[in-house]
From Swiss-Prot:
Belongs to the delta endotoxin family. Promotes colloidosmotic lysis by binding to the midgut epithelial cells of both dipteran (Aedes aegypti) and lepidopteran (Manduca sexta) larvae. It comes from Bacillus thuringiensis subsp. kurstaki. One of its GO terms (molecular function) is toxin activity. The gene is cry2Aa. GO terms for biological process: sporulation resulting in formation of a cellular spore; symbiont-mediated killing of host cell. This is Pesticidal crystal protein Cry2Aa.
């Protein structure tokens, strides 16, 4: 144990945070409710070109990974994507993507894609019917297995998937490819889980286990590479950059991040994957490229392990009469300085001006775990009354689950809300970000003021960014404002995102690294003998603890829980990995051993890493897997 982590700080939960709320609200929702919420979202809430079915599918897959009920995912997935055999929802996804990217398939390619959609849904429907007939036979004699149908369906998937990877349209077709990959990987998982009931031989079962690993690798790498190629070509305003990322996360990476977890069963995924939203006001004209993204990303993520309570800042409203004695006036509302506040008295650095007294405070009012923020308004613009009077407005407003609102100014314009997502962090940028900041990403929990270059007209202004994710199984706040993770009451497995640590030593050499295939981002250690501590509220169950790590070089992992130390030496994932290249990380899931999450107790979990080769180490996921449900590969 590092002395840094034994510096006298004790873990005490804030009593006011332990209130009646449902930390497993997503798991308790029915699929019908989820579908209705996404339909309502599309109807009333968002201008983003996203078909609501994409949100329903990601929620469905997360619920299936977290459940033992129903082993035939493909049958249910077909009903969601192709209701009554219709391809309309898949065509909706394509039309929405065409509008968002301002690109269209040519006539011949569109006809080809539509024909593939019709063929794909018909193939899956026929396969599902064959399985139904096998399980409820009307013919005699009853076939001993359905292997022939399984192998035929496998080949049909292999024939059809390339039709959604057409040269010149890879990005445009990526959301359709992701849905087709969802169905293919669900099919393979179904074969593995139903092998006994379907009469699948041991040899065929081994083949399909290999298929699950190999096609998870291939499809993940294709999606990541296609997205990154497009992202590297961006040179645009922050709003447009974040909107592109959010669009691709909803349509593609919500699925990619689940695929690598398909090998687990009954694993409740506590996601740390974020959606970002910002305003589209005309004042923010600074352009950003992919080279600037590491800094921006670190700014938005730096305090993700704290429990958000609100913001404070300086809002100004100034009216100037028109010059020369002409009638009319110009009124300007602006947020000129902002600070993000968290439980435990923790605050971020200042955004915008650093020398102004704050004159407003926006908080959840009620305990932040009970009533977190879920919606933001971040736009700005200009209203004109006639030809002589104008008002430059700005919003920076937020709403809780109880519809309580607060902010710098009144809510107006487009709102940012996603079903089952909470605003777990708020960040922001000044009018212009200094070059010296753009080249220096923030380290873990760094407090740094972010301001415009001296002398920039309007440089005092701040523009906020809301950070949305699904993380909800939070028991309480530690004394230092970080989250205590809550284990499920039953024997369901669960995950902890590594970025949601209680505390970390060597912070100046620890960074959050963006990941796409992992249900959240990694904690990157660049200094040896670094320890990350996590706190969880136990349930008394025994689990196999798996750590998803990337170690390009030899490392030693020491895990301490309940006074017991587990050591794994010579960890090197350079070649021994799952094959996915996730933004430079090549990961493998390491079985640390059997642990017990003590019942009704705050349990500390310390993960210490020694870098024997001096190379960076990514801690990508912490998984508590039921002992009776080993991974499928």
């Amino acid at each position: 144990m590092n002395n840094v982590l034994n510096s006298g700080r004790t873990t005490i939960c804030d009593a006011y945070n332990v209130v009646a709320h449902d930390p497993f609200s997503f798991e308790h929702k029915s699929l019908d409710t989820i579908q209705k919420e996404w339909m309502e979202w599309k109807r009333t809430d968002h201008s983003l070109y996203v078909a609501p079915v994409v949100g329903t599918v990601s929620s469905f897959l997360l619920k299936k990974v977290g459940s033992l009920i129903g082993k035939r995912i493909l049958s249910e997935l077909w009903g969601i994507i192709f209701p009554s055999g219709s391809t309309n929802l898949m065509q909706d996804i394509l039309r929405e993507t065409e509008q968002f990217l301002n690109q269209r398939l040519n006539t011949d390619t569109l006809a080809r894609v539509n024909a593939e959609l019709i063929g794909l849904q018909a193939n899956i429907r026929e396969f599902n019917q064959q399985v139904d007939n096998f399980l409820n036979p009307t013919q005699n004699p009853v076939p001993l297995s359905i292997t022939s149908s399984v192998n035929t369906m496998q080949q049909l998937f292999l024939n059809r998937l390339p039709q959604f990877q057409i040269q010149g349209y890879q990005l445009l077709l990526l959301p359709l490819f992701a849905q087709a990959a969802n169905m293919h990987l669900s099919f393979i998982r179904d074969v593995i889980l139903n092998a006994d009931e379907w009469g699948i031989s041991a040899a065929t079962l081994r083949t399909y286990r290999d298929y699950l690993r190999n096609y998870t690798r291939d499809y993940s790498n294709y999606c990541i590479n296609t997205y990154q190629t497009a992202f590297r070509g961006l040179n645009t305003r922050l709003h447009d950059m974040l909107e592109f990322r959010t669009y691709m996360f909803l349509n593609v990476f919500e699925y990619v991040s689940i695929w690598s977890l398909f090998k687990y069963q009954s694993l409740m995924v506590s996601s740390g994957a974020n959606l970002y939203a910002s305003g589209s006001g005309p004042q923010q004209t600074q352009s950003f490229t992919a080279q600037n993204w590491p800094f921006l990303y670190s700014l938005f993520q730096v305090n993700s392990n704290y429990i958000l309570s609100g913001i404070s800042g300086t809002r100004l409203s100034i009216t100037f009469p028109n010059i020369g004695g002409l009638p009319g006036s110009t009124t300007t509302h602006s947020l000129n300085s902002a600070r993000v506040n968290y439980s435990g008295g923790v605050s971020s650095g200042l955004i915008g001006a650093t020398n102004l007294n704050h004159n407003f405070n926006c908080s959840t009012v009620l305990p932040p775990l009970s009533t977190p923020f879920v919606r933001s308004w971040l736009d700005s613009g200009t209203d004109r009354e006639g030809v002589a009077t104008s008002t430059n407005w700005q919003t920076e407003s937020f709403q809780t689950t109880l519809s309580l609102r607060c902010g710098a100014f009144s809510a107006r314009g487009n709102s940012n809300y996603f079903p089952d997502y909470f605003i777990r962090n708020i960040s922001g940028v000044p009018l212009v970000i200094r070059n010296e900041d753009l080249t220096r990403p923030l380290h873990y929990n760094q407090i740094r003021n972010i301001e415009s270059p001296s002398g920039t007209p309007g440089g005092a202004r701040a523009y906020l960014v809301s950070v949305h994710n699904r993380k909800n199984n939070i028991y309480a706040a530690n004394e230092n404002g970080t989250m205590i993770h809550l284990a499920p009451e039953d024997y369901t497995g669960f995950t902890i995102s590594p970025i949601h640590a209680t505390q970390v030593n060597n912070q100046t050499r620890t960074f959050i690294s963006e990941k796409f295939g992992n249900q959240g981002d990694s904690l990157r250690f660049e200094q040896s003998n670094t320890t990350a501590r996590y706190t969880l509220r136990g349930n008394g169950n025994s689990y196999n603890l798996y750590l998803r790590v990337s170690s390009i070089g030899n490392s030693t992992i020491r895990v301490t829980i309940n006074g017991r130390v587990y050591t794994v030496s010579n960890v090197n994932t350079t070649t021994n990995n799952d094959g996915v290249n996730d933004n430079g990380a090549r990961f493998s899931d390491i079985n640390i051993g059997n642990i017990v999450a003590s019942d009704n107790t705050n349990v500390t979990l310390d993960i210490n890493v020694t870098l024997n080769s001096g190379t960076p180490f990514d801690l990508m996921n912490i998984m508590f897997v039921p002992t009776n449900l080993p991974p499928l590969y």
